[in-house]
């Protein structure tokens, strides 16, 4: 088995070796190059298909393979590469050859020479085939879009050592691929032929000879293909003669003649010219290759000077005065006849832009008279054909405001050269060009023997050995220091040895630290430059000529120096390379450079010695002679610039180009039209006197130009590809997938989701129906609005399309303009007057008064205004400039509308008023056909017709006549009906009267008495008779009527029937009514005693009967009366009793209601009074803490009687407030492992997840902490928490609620008297009233407060015993032992925003506990949504900050109540006031939460600035300033207004209401403020257990800023005195100054406002030209064209007024802060700094670090991953790396990594995270001493953060590598991860 595994391992290793070998890689890459198909394949394919005979086929393949072999060889062999790979050959040879081929061989049968008997090799056709394939293989062009495959070999060649082997294997690989390809091609051809010959019958007759035709037309097909490639390459490689020649910058062309003869001519001979031209001729696919400055194929030392000069502003007039030459007399290895001359040009003239006056130009010149006639013929030819400065390719011309010419894009940011890396010679792509240049110069001047190459193995071994030695030394030193620290000795052995530069070994004199190049950090000062501009200005030119300046390059040659500065200590760890050493060493000898030459001539031994040494450095023989002065040349990479100063078309139109630039534009801008809308001084011809106001309007079509330069080829552009025949918009190919998604993979997600939700929809059908009913009208409304929007957008699109069409057609504008003018003339002077005449004549015909005056008045009112193409009004008479070319619009104001009559204007009707409102914006644009359109090119609108009101009026009159007619008809009908009815009634009365008379007669005839009821019968019978009679009579009448009518009516039969039916119905209805009334009468019996009846008995009986009836009823009543009275009394009593009962209840209810009203009234009155008081005091004391928690009065104590109000959080909170109680009693609750009845289990789990339980509360055994557990822990540290902005993007709802709850103001919720009455709290009302996103419910608020108190209280009780030295509970700023919450001292980035709001931060407010301000410079996040900042609102907004420190009896502090923002409309934006309130400074004041009052006033919709309370009060001062530009203001300015050092007595002397202006105080205040600002950030020193703070002496922290501030204040004072008239108040001037000085911002206006402004401008243009503009201005205001609110009528408007009006909104520009370079470096590299108290022995160096603050404003570095602890414990030494300096620390890690074999530190560190290896710490931890309680957590945290996740090391590995400096670019990191530290 072992043997088998051994064999298997060998096989695997062998396979790996084979795969990684050069041969296999070459074969692979060569095989890939087969697929880069070029035109040579076309020739080969044609030879195989068409040529007869094997000789031609063989010759074709032979030529093809030979050409490819030559190409492979040319990769390695430089001369062949130069011959074949240069664009000269391609342009000169390839294109003519292609054209020749096309025209010569454009025949059906070509190469048909017939059979010859000669030798086949001598046959011309075979040779031609061979040559064709060979030459086409050499041509470097490809058909496929990417030429990457063909260049793979070239790319891999860089990495390969054995290049010849690689090239040959690559060629073999290509040959294999080619053979396979040819075989496959042959098989295809054979298959086609066989297919044609075997199955001819299957083809239809027309297609029978298709393949034969194809073979015959092959020649033509190939020639067409070749022609296409020829045209393609003609487009890609333009003809040099035909392209447009741009005019070069005139100043660049003007050179001194002698210089011109010898400056750039050398470029033509050098290879650099070739490489530059190669960029021009290279293919489109790779337009930005990266050539090295020095290619490998034979280096020419002259090339390095062959870049073009950069002249700033073209000022080189005084150049000749600085000319100086240094002739070199002889060298051993350089031919003296061709020795170059150094020409130095001192470019002091560019100091206005570059800022570096010693940036000298160095050029290589030839001798004056040599080679003068050599290149005279070459220059015009070469520059004509191959001028690399010409814009043949579509490069972008990227301008820079500081320089004139644009940078050439072909220059790579990478620089390739060989360097030592990991002990091997490798090609580095980030090699510093200066070093390369330097090394080439040294090579040219040193003998060849000294430059012998060492073998790579030797170098590797040497590197490994030195690295081992260095790492061993480091480890030894490190372990020695650990042992010393372990012994706790305070000897100097702990100190790290520093290598210093010494002047003299014997005396041990060192160079001052300021100039010591071997020291770094705060020891170093600024290095003074050679010259300052003031010296240059003061000294004359002659002195400058005579000045001797040391050239830094020459100091590298120091063979026999008399100065021994470079003698160093034996320890070579900090030894730097020579180049950087000399760069720093020259600061020593700058003093010699600053003296004129005359002083050097004095016989001073030292100085002559020095000059001797300098020139001995160049040649040991000392044969040099100084002819003229030498200028300093900073070796730097020259940037090639274009020699043209190009301007865009837009710049030409606007006239924004400088002098010396050609007037014609070279860059094509987007298609735009410059429309002049107003010109002053029209009469004068002088263009300088004329002032034009112009608008630039862009066309709506896509921009196909994209800043292309004239003469460059559009086809070569990569990012604007046109792939369709007609393409509307131009797109980059990169985004094509976004524009047109593929159809195959596109599917509707909603269709997939529907079946999933079908079941749910079935279950909840009812709800769906209800929702549908509710949502249906909404949907319909939405549909309607969408339809309207769609139609509107369609119309707009159509309008734009019409406009573009008119613009694109040739001569369209001329035709359109002339048509419009004719239409306007026709309308105004012909059409409308003729209509007016016709109308009035018609009125006269109809006998009406004519309306000549009214119509003519309206006709005169109509104005035809000439407008620009975009509708900007000019005037009636003035035409726009170039209107025939650019187009014109005619706008009709008050268009005339012909009316048939005019209504009197005295009393207009309501309808007329409504019409007027609609016609407010009554204007239109004239169309080509004389119609009216609302917008230019819009659809014509319908005009109101003339005849419509006439027809309406006629209809009205007709209607009135109809009404009158119908009314008369009605009256007549009614009268006839009444007559009929009267006649009927009279008839009835007559009949009745007759009957009655008959009855009387009968009765009189009778003597007998007639009984009553009998008479009734008779009457009934009579009635029946009556009915019969009436029926008969009716019938008779009807018959008679019908007879009479039937004579007159033509269709009498039908009408008769109808009439009969009607009469029958009416009669029957009448009879029925009469019968019913009579029956009712019969029901009540009548007592009819006739007068004739004389029977008295009857009378008596009737009366008796009546009496009896009455008596019966009376007895019943008397019988029931007793019960009735009884019941009545009972009811009465009950009602009385109920009313008596209800009276007090009603009264109490009324009383309660009245009292409630009174209370409410009283409260509101109090609030009003309170507001009045606040207004007087300028303090919005809207809500206060009436009583503190510990001072609850007896009156309020009844609130807490109910135990339900008590919660655990409240109990714990009360206990925490009492300072006497011992919280250790509650430790059992937290230590109890099972569930506890008192403390909720959630809290315990919460702390377990936090990882902050003490070792007592958990297992004694250390857990193995992996990354997941540490993630949980780190989430609770704010520096690892995301900002609110990021969280709100991730989880919008949950996190936003949480953040809003944590960020809400705490001023009211802390009062626990209202623990359960949050709903009534004003804060919530305020939040509801606010127009903000912070919707937080009262219950969530309540829960959050509870949660917070739970966490806080349990946290306190857990860490109670160990509070003195606990890790988490003790802050870096802790001065008091009552502070509980941990906060990291690294306050950069997001901490101010991520901090939970409800922190106990009163202990942060002390004098010394100000954060190190410089660290906050990198904050860039700013949550605008939370802060609600808007300058558009006005109002009186102040904030009152209550700060109550938890001070000790021995400390005295002054407390300031800061007023944040004053009234904006009165005082300006940033007016700060300070209220001194000495009452709050009580010695024994208890702990009060940090409280922010105010900001609750509602102004319009929302307050200007919603102050959140996470900021420290120190920063609150200038927070309103800081919020606009938090990354530009120096953060130290935030501390300028602090008065925390004032005593109470001083506070008492200051009036409470005294306001101190922040920006323009008196001089005394300035000095006080600056003095206050000088106070350094307190280092937090405090003895353990002491209650007295150590006072820190103020140091010069802000020396730099002090000067700036004094300047600012002085400037503002002078500005104030100068500009008193311009500003209404001081604050406006202050604000102006402040914004200019400290802030960089852009003023933005809304889009809506922008549109309104443009409309206003259009109206202004018209009004300026009118003689009497009042009429038009009033009408335009009425129509809404001109908005008065944004009209700026005042002369001088300040910024504040503009912002108040809402016109301008301040928007910050995000810029990077220009930080101090040292500060960035130490912020990036510097790990933590151990506190002073631990390194008292290190004072010699450390004190220097604290005191030297001249350049480094304060050199104390705040820690990034650890805390500063004020006690003398050794926490920071748990991480051993903290002993070393940062540079040595990184060096130690990297060197230990190079030597390590096992890498296991990627996920976790085995030593520091394993329980078993904990004892390995004994080297630096004393096991005898007990660990502190929290030391385990600390160790885990630090060892987790140390080795695995040190990001600053990985990011800056390349930038700040130890012992070298290789530029600022990040290269590929070769360090994966450094392993654990080995302790032997």
From Swiss-Prot:
GO terms for cellular component: chloroplast inner membrane. The chain crosses the membrane at residues 18-38, 64-84, 87-107, 124-144, 172-192, 221-241. GO terms for biological process: protein transport. InterPro entries: TIC214 (IPR008896). It holds the Pfam family Ycf1. It is a multi-pass membrane protein. Residues 1572-1590, 1601-1615 have a biased composition (Basic and acidic residues). It comes from the Eukaryota. It is found in: Plastid, Chloroplast inner membrane. Residues 256-268 have a biased composition (Acidic residues). Residues 248-299, 1572-1622 are annotated as: Disordered. Keywords: Chloroplast, Membrane, Plastid, Plastid inner membrane, Protein transport, Transmembrane, Transmembrane helix, Transport. Part of the Tic complex. Involved in protein precursor import into chloroplasts. May be part of an intermediate translocation complex acting as a protein-conducting channel at the inner envelope. Belongs to the TIC214 family. There is a partial copy of the N-terminus (positions 1-489) of ycf1 in the inverted repeat (CAC88092). This is Protein TIC 214. The gene is TIC214.
């Amino acid at each position: 088995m072992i043997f088998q595994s051994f064999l298997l391992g060998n096989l695997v290793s062998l396979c790996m070796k084979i795969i990684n070998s050069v041969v296999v890689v070459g074969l692979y890459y060569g095989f890939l190059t087969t697929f880069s198909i070029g035109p040579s394949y076309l020739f080969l394919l044609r030879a195989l298909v068409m040529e007869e005979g094997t000789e031609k086929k063989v010759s074709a393949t032979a030529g093809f393979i030979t050409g490819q072999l030559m190409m492979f060889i040319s990769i390695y062999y430089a001369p062949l590469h130069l011959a074949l790979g240069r664009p000269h050959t391609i342009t000169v040879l390839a294109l003519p050859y292609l054209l020749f081929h096309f025209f010569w061989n454009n025949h059906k049968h070509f190469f048909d020479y017939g059979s010859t008997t000669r030798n086949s090799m001598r046959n011309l056709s075979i040779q031609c085939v061979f040559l064709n394939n060979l030459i086409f293989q050499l041509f470097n062009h490809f058909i496929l879009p990417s030429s990457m495959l063909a260049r793979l070999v070239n790319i891999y060649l860089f990495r390969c050592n054995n290049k010849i082997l690689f090239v040959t294997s690559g060629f073999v690989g290509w040959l294999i691929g080619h053979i396979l390809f040819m075989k496959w091609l042959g098989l295809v051809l054979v298959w086609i032929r066989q297919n044609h010959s075997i199955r001819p019958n299957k083809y239809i007759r027309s297609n029978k000879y298709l393949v034969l035709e194809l073979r015959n037309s092959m020649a033509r097909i190939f020639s067409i293909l070749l022609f296409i490639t020829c045209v393609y390459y003609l487009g890609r490689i333009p003809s040099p003669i035909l392209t447009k020649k741009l005019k070069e910058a005139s100043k660049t062309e003007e050179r001194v003649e002698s210089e011109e003869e010898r400056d750039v001519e050398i470029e033509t001979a050098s290879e650099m010219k070739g490489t530059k031209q190669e960029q021009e001729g290279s293919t489109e696919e790779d337009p930005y290759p990266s050539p090295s400055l020095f290619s490998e194929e034979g280096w020419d030392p002259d090339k390095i000077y062959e870049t073009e000069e950069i002249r700033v502003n073209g000022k080189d007039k005084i150049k000749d005065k600085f000319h100086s030459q240094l002739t070199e007399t002889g060298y051993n290895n350089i031919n003296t006849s061709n020795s170059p001359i150094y020409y130095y040009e001192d470019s002091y003239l560019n100091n206005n832009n570059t800022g570096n006056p010693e940036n000298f130009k160095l050029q290589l010149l030839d001798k004056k008279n040599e080679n003068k006639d050599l290149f005279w013929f070459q220059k015009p030819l070469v520059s004509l054909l191959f001028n690399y400065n010409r814009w043949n390719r579509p490069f972008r011309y990227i301008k820079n405001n500081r320089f004139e010419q644009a940078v050439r894009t072909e220059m790579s940011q990478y620089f390739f050269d060989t360097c030592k890396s990991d002990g091997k010679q490798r090609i580095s792509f980030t090699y510093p060009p200066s070093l390369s240049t330097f090394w080439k110069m040294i090579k040219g001047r040193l003998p060849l023997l000294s430059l012998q190459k060492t073998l790579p193995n030797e170098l590797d071994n040497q590197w490994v050995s030195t690295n081992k030695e260095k790492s061993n030394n480091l480890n030894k030193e490190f372990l020695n220091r650990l042992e010393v620290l372990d012994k706790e000795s305070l000897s100097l052995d702990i100190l790290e040895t520093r290598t210093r530069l010494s002047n003299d070994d014997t005396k041990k004199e060192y160079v001052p630290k300021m100039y010591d190049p071997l020291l770094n950090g705060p020891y170093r000062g600024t290095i003074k430059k050679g010259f300052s501009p003031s010296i240059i200005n003061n000294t004359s030119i002659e002195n400058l000529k005579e000045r001797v300046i040391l050239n830094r390059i020459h100091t590298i040659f120091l063979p026999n120096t008399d100065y021994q500065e470079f003698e160093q200590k034996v320890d070579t760890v900090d030894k730097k390379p020579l180049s950087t050493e000399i760069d720093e060493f020259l600061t020593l000898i700058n003093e010699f450079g600053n003296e004129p030459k005359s002083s050097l001539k004095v016989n001073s031994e030292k100085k002559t010695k020095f000059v001797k040494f300098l020139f001995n450095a160049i040649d040991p023989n000392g044969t040099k002679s100084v002819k003229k002065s030498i200028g300093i040349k900073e070796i730097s990479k020259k940037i090639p610039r274009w020699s043209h100063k190009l301007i865009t078309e837009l710049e030409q139109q606007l006239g924004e180009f400088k002098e010396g630039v050609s007037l014609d534009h070279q860059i094509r801008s987007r298609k735009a039209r410059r429309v002049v809308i107003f010109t002053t001084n029209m009469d004068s011809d002088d263009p300088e006197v004329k002032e034009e106001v112009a608008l630039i309007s862009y066309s709506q079509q896509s921009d196909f130009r994209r800043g292309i330069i004239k003469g460059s080829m559009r086809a070569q552009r990569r990012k604007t590809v046109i792939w369709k025949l007609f393409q509307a918009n131009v797109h980059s190919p990169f985004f094509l997938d976004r524009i047109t998604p593929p159809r195959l993979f596109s599917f509707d997600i909603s269709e997939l989701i529907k079946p999933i939700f079908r079941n749910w929809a079935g279950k909840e059908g009812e709800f769906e129906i209800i929702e549908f009913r509710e949502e249906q009208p909404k949907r319909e409304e939405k549909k309607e609005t969408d339809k309207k929007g769609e139609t509107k957008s369609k119309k707009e699109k159509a309008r734009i399309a019409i406009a573009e069409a008119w613009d694109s057609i040739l001569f369209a504008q001329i035709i359109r303009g002339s048509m419009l003018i004719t239409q306007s003339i026709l309308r105004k002077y012909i059409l409308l007057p003729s209509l007016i005449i016709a109308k009035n004549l018609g009125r006269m015909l109809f006998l009406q008064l004519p309306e000549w005056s009214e119509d003519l008045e309206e006709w005169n009112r109509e104005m035809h205004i000439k407008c620009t193409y975009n509708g900007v009004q000019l005037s009636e008479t003035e035409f726009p400039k170039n209107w025939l070319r650019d187009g014109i619009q005619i706008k009709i104001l008050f268009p005339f509308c012909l009316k048939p009559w005019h209504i009197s204007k005295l009393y207009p009707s309501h309808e007329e008023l409504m019409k007027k409102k609609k016609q407010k914006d009554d204007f239109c644009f004239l169309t080509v056909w004389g119609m009216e359109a609302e917008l230019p090119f819009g659809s014509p609108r319908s005009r109101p017709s003339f005849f419509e009101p006439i027809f309406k009026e006629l209809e009205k009159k007709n209607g009135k006549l109809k009404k009158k007619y119908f009314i008369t008809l009605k009256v007549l009908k009614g009268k006839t009906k009444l007559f009929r009815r009267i006649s009927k009634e009279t008839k009835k009365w007559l009949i009745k009267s007759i009957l009655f008379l008959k009855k009387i007669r009968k009765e009189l005839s009778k003597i007998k008495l007639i009984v009553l009821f009998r008479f009734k019968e008779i009457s009934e019978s009579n009635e029946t008779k009556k009915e019969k009679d009436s029926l008969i009579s009716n019938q008779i009448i009807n018959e008679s009527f019908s007879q009479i009518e039937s004579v007159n009516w033509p269709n009498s039969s039908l009408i008769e029937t109808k009439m009969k039916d009607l009469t029958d119905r009416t009669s029957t209805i009448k009879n029925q009514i009469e019968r019913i009334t009579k029956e009712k009468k019969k029901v009540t019996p009548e007592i009819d005693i006739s007068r004739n009846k004389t029977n008295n008995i009857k009378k008596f009986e009737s009366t008796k009967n009546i009496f009896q009836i009455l008596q019966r009823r009376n007895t019943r009543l008397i019988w029931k009366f007793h019960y009735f009275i009884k019941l009545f009394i009972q009811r009465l009593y009950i009602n009385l009793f109920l009313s008596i009962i209800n009276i007090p209840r009603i009264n109490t209810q009324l009383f309660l209601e009245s009292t409630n009203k009174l209370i409410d009234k009283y409260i509101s009155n109090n609030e009003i009074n309170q507001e009045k008081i606040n207004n007087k005091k300028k303090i919005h004391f809207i809500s206060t803490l009436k009583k503190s928690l510990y001072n609850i009065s007896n009156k309020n104590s009844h609130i807490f009687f109910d135990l339900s109000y008590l919660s655990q959080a409240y109990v714990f909170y009360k206990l925490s407030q009492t300072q006497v109680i011992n919280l250790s009693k509650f430790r059992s609750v937290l230590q109890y492992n099972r569930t506890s009845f008192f403390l909720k289990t959630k809290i315990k789990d919460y702390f377990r997840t936090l990882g902050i339980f003490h070792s007592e509360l958990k297992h004694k055994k250390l857990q193995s902490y992996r990354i997941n557990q540490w993630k949980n822990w780190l989430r609770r540290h704010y520096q690892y928490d995301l900002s609110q902005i990021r969280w709100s993007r991730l989880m919008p709802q949950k996190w936003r609620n949480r953040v809003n709850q944590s960020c809400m103001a705490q001023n009211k919720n802390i009062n626990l008297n209202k623990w359960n009455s949050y709903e009534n709290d004003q804060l919530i009302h305020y939040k509801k009233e606010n127009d903000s996103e912070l919707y937080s419910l009262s219950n969530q608020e309540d829960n959050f407060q509870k949660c917070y108190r739970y966490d806080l209280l349990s946290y306190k009780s857990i860490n109670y015993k160990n509070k003195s030295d606990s890790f988490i509970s003790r802050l870096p700023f802790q001065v008091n032992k009552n502070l509980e919450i941990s906060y990291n001292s690294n306050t950069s980035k997001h901490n101010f925003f991520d901090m939970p709001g409800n922190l106990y931060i009163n202990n942060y407010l002390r004098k010394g506990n100000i954060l190190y301000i410089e660290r906050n410079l990198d904050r860039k996040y700013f949550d605008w949504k939370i802060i609600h900042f808007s300058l558009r609102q006005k109002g009186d907004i102040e904030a009152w900050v209550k700060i109550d420190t938890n001070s000790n009896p021995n400390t005295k502090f002054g407390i300031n109540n800061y007023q944040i923002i004053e009234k904006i409309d009165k005082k300006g934006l940033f007016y700060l006031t300070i209220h001194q309130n000495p009452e709050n400074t009580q010695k024994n004041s208890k702990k009060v939460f940090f409280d922010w009052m105010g900001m609750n006033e509602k102004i319009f919709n929302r307050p200007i600035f919603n102050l959140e309370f996470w900021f420290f009060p120190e920063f609150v001062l200038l927070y309103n300033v800081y919020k606009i530009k938090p990354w530009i203001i120096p953060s130290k300015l935030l501390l300028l207004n602090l008065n925390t050092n004032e005593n109470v007595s001083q506070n008492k002397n200051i009036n409470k209401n005294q306001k101190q202006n922040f920006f323009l105080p008196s001089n005394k205040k300035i000095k006080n403020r600056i003095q206050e600002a000088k106070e350094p950030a307190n280092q937090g020193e405090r003895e353990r257990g002491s209650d007295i703070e150590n006072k820190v002496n103020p140091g010069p922290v802000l020396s730099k800023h002090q000067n700036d501030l004094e300047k600012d204040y002085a400037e503002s004072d002078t500005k104030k005195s100068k500009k008193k008239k311009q500003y209404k108040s001081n604050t406006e001037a202050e604000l102006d100054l402040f914004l200019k000085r400290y802030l960089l911002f852009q003023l933005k206006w809304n889009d809506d406002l922008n549109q309104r402004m443009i409309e206003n401008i259009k109206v202004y243009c018209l009004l300026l030209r009118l003689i009497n503009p009042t009429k038009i201005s009033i009408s335009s205001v009425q129509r809404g064209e001109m908005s008065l609110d944004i009209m700026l009528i005042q002369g001088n408007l300040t910024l504040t007024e503009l912002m108040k009006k809402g016109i301008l909104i301040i928007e910050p520009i995000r810029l990077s802060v220009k930080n101090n370079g040292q500060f960035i470096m130490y912020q990036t590299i510097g790990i933590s700094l151990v506190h002073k108290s631990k390194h008292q022995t290190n004072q010699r160096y450390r004190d220097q670090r604290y005191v030297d603050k001249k350049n480094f404003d304060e050199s104390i570095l705040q820690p990034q991953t650890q805390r500063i602890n004020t006690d003398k414990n050794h926490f920071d030494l748990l991480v051993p790396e903290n002993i070393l300096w940062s540079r040595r620390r990184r060096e130690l890690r990297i060197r230990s990594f190079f030597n390590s074999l096992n890498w296991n530190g990627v996920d976790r560190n085995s030593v520091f995270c394993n329980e078993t290896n904990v004892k390995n710490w004994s080297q630096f931890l004393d096991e005898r001493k007990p660990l502190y309680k929290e030391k385990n957590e600390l160790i885990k945290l630090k060892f987790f953060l140390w080795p695995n996740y040190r990001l600053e090391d990985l990011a800056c590995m390349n930038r700040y590598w130890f012992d070298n400096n290789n530029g600022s670019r990040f290269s590929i990191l070769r360090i994966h991860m450094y392993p654990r530290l080995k302790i032997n």
